[in-house]
């Protein structure tokens, strides 16, 4: 279980990780706010104002921008959490060898740090979504979104931990994961609309691509105002639990 020492360690590592990203820069941690502001603003200007792109059958001029941003922001956190967790044991070897830590919980600081970054980005997006795009979102949908983010980060952490253990034994895992995540990104309808894909690819996506479930839920919230049904969380939690359990078993071999 997490003791007070581990909680303090993870808290300090989380804050340190967040600060280290912008260490030495003039604006410091303000870049955590500046980056999403610039990215979201550029997407809205390019796809809404310049290209006038919108989803088929939608009268909302900003529908494609919402479609893109609502999928891209969570994916960036998911991908970064997974890949960074997979490298944590190697990158923080100096700390692990000096301090007795529980390897199962040690990389949690990455999960929390990326979660904070995601929240900052999404808060600004919701601000733009409501005030400038004139869309509605209620507290229930926001809570639903937070629960989804927690499940996503749990899933990313579980996978990252599994790859992190394998990375100790097989150093090629880091390079493999870079290629794998790139393929996963482009095979997931984040920047393209699912309906343009061949039917055979759509079936594979529905049966194999777990992240597609997250994507559908996020877009259901922002594009349709739908809340997730409770039964949808069960299978995903089970998968994350199985992956995490496998990782914890392998960690005991280290």
Language model segments and positions:
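Hydrophobic transmembrane alpha-helices and immediately adjacent juxtamembrane helices
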Residues: 1-254
């Amino acid at each position: 279980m997490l003791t007070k020492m581990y909680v303090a360690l993870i808290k300090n590592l989380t804050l340190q990780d967040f600060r280290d990203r912008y260490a030495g820069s003039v604006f410091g941690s303000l870049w955590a706010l500046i980056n999403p502001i610039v990215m979201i603003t550029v997407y809205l200007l390019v796809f809404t104002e310049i290209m006038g792109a919108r989803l088929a059958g939608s009268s909302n001029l900003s529908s494609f921008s919402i479609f893109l941003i609502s999928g891209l922001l969570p994916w960036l956190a998911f991908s970064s959490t997974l890949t960074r967790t997979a490298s944590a044991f190697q990158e923080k070897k100096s700390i692990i060898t000096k301090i007795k830590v529980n390897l199962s919980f040690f990389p949690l600081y990455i999960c929390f740090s990326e979660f904070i970054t995601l929240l900052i980005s999404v808060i600004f997006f919701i601000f733009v979504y409501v005030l400038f795009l004139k869309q509605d979102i209620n507290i229930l949908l926001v809570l639903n979104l937070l629960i989804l983010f927690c499940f996503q980060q749990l899933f990313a952490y579980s996978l990252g931990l599994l790859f992190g253990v394998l990375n100790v034994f097989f150093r090629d895992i880091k390079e493999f994961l870079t290629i794998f995540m790139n393929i996963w990104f482009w095979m997931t309808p984040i920047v393209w609309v699912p309906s343009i894909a061949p039917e055979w690819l759509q079936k594979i996506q529905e049966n194999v691509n777990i992240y597609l479930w997250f994507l559908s839920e996020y877009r259901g919230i922002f594009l349709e105002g739908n809340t997730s049904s409770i039964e949808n969380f069960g299978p995903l939690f089970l998968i994350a639990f199985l992956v995490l359990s496998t990782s914890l078993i392998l960690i005991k071999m280290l």
